[in-house]
Every structure is written in structure tokens, then in C-alpha cells.
Amino acid sequence: MADRLSLHSHLTNEGGPLAKSISGNDEQSPIEGRAASSRSAQTSATHKEARAPRSDDHAIVSTDRHVLANDRIKGLARRTFNKHVLSEIGGFSGLFALDAERFPDPVLVASTDGVGSKLELAIQLGLHSSIGSDLVNHCVNDVAVQGATPLFFLDYFAAGHIDPDIVQQVISGLVDACKANACALLGGETAETPWLYGNTDYELAGFLTGVVSRPRLITGEAIREGDCLLGLPSNGLHTTGYSLALKLLLNTAGYRPEQYVNELGDKVGAALMRPHRSYLSPIRKLIQAEVVTGFSHITGGGLTENLPRILPRGLAAHVDLSAWDPPPLFTHLKKLGSLDHDEMFRTFNMGIGLVAVVPADLVKKARLTLTRMNERSIVLGRVIRKATPRIVYS
């Protein structure tokens, strides 16, 4: 991605009016009243050492900040609890009771991820809550495409300097997304590691567990030649392609995040910071309608690398490029970087965030199911018999 010096040259008002001018909001969403869940009271070794009596004032301040951050987290996190959460805040681990009646013959489905280079931009703009939603939604989609229901989420937050206000904003985003996807924020870790991160830097990772009854597990093995590829739109880059996008927009073009660009139809920062969509609702509706043989969440690697992941041996995806027009963000990135087709479709989602594989005779029913929930769909192509390459564009 663009190096920090390049980003800093464009981002000079961290977290304040600049963030407001990019988002178009005069004030940030209130954190009071947001949902939450259980979080471990454990700290990294750094904080355990800081709790011992010392004359080092910095160590004492570090401990105070860490305690304040964790207190705020607890108030948020507890609100995502449901009847299946058995642990209270402060334990060594989170406890969750599986509903065996609802999920007979259960299979646990797990996913872990980060948000990549998008985090760098979020830090510089002070838009910390949206990055939490990005992370949860990404993980939710990864388990949902297997037919799983999200159960609980855990996060790992590490920073060079624990700022309770920033931690609260990040966790509030996690909590909002957990509530929206009906999963519990079961726990997490907050670590201060100044020898690894700069004073304003942090890293965020998440871990999500879901469950599905074995007979309802979706693996793609039921996909057959002639099945239709039904695409659901993304709302932007989601969480992939940011290294290249930041380089092209901020360095090559020299745009400022608060700058409105006609080719984008939006401010640069707003176009880049749109949250990663959760596709849980349309996935559930399609599963309930019994019209799908597989799903592909289009993340890093784009359509080119993600569609083949679900196809049985000997089958390939044929994608009709005339079926949809990629949103302006992607066409402008292509122009700025003089990028060829292959690089675009391997780097970006090109406006498609999820692909549902549907038998040809069920396409009408599938699209009607989506239309009824105001979800747009695009017939992208079909599954063909071909050993290699695993995806063909025409």
C-alpha cells in the first residue's frame, strides 16, 4: 500500500473535522446504547508487568488507560449476550452453549480475518467504528456461504499506545455488526505493544464461529454443469484491493480524501470507506427457498480466484462481461493504473460481493426471492465443463 509518509501528506487532520468532511456527517454516531458482549480481563504480558508496583509513572498511566479501555469494552460487549452465553466478563475464556435441538448433528464452522490496508486509511481518517463492522461482516460472510449461522465473535486489538476513546469506537463497530448479524461478542484481547506499533497505529483481527447441521452444510459439491452464476452487488472495495487503490488514488492521482471526484461521484474517502456488506440475510433466504448449490464470497483474489474455490473438479465458471457494468470506482482505478483485465479481476471484486450458484430451472425463483427483499441480482454466467482454466471471461 502507499507508505505512511505518502498517506500523512494527504491526511492532516486525524479523526476530527477531516473525518467529518469525508463522511459528510457533522458528528459521529453516539456510542451510548450500542450492543455488546463478554471480553476477557486478561492483558498482554506488558500490562501484567505494569500492574506490579513500580516507580515508573508511564507504566502506571499505561495500566490506567488499559483498565479504562477494558471497562468501556465491558459496557458495550455485555449487550450482545444471549441465553447461550454462559460466561461473565473477566474469565479466562468465553463459554457458549450450543443449541442442539436447533442444530442436530452440528458442524462448527470457523473463520478468522483482518481488514488489510483499509485499516491504515481508517486510522488516518479517525473513522474507527466502521472498521469494526468491516471485520465482523467479512467473517460472517465466510461462514454463511457454508450454510452456517454465526454464533460468536472474538477480537484481537493490539496498539502501540492504548487510547480508550479509539478502543471504544472500534469495539462499538464490532458490537453494532455483531448485533446486526445476531452473534455474541464473546471475548477479546487488548494488548499494548509499543515495540511493534507506532504511537497511533493498531492492528485488528477477528475470529468467528458458526454452526450448521451436517445435512445442510453447503460445500459446492452439488454444483453441476449448466448451473447459473447469480451475482449480488458489493457497495465498494469491501476489504480487498486497498494497497493498490490507495496508491492509485492518493499517490498517482494526488487526490485528497476529502476531495470530491467527478469520476467517482463521491468524495475519495467516502468511496473507500464504505463498510463491507453482510450477505447473511440474502444467503439465508436463498437457502430457505432451496434454490442454491453453492456460494462464493468475493474477497481477496476477486472473481478469478474465489469462484473456482467452490467448483467441483472438471467444472469451470464462464462469466459474461457484458452482464454488468462495474461501478465508477473500479473503472476509474483501471484508468489511473492502466490496469489490464486480469489484474482488475484478481485484485478487486468489480462490483460483485457474493455469487450464488443456482440450478438453471430455479433461477427465476431465486431472483424473485431476492427481489422481495429489495436485493438486486445479476446473471453473471454459468458453470461449464472445463478442466482448465477454472474461470473464463468473454
Task: Label the model's feature ranges.
Residues 112, 203, 216-264, 268, ...:
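Short, acidic (Asp/Glu-rich) active-site segment that either coordinates a divalent metal cofactor
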Residues 2-10, 19-23, 32, 39, ...:
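Glycine-/charge-enriched secondary-structure boundary and capping motifs
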Residues 75-235:
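Glycine-rich phosphate/pyrophosphate-binding loop regions near the starts of catalytic domains
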Residues 100-101, 114-116, 209-213, 235-237, ...:
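Short, glycine-/Ser/Thr-/acidic-enriched flexible segments
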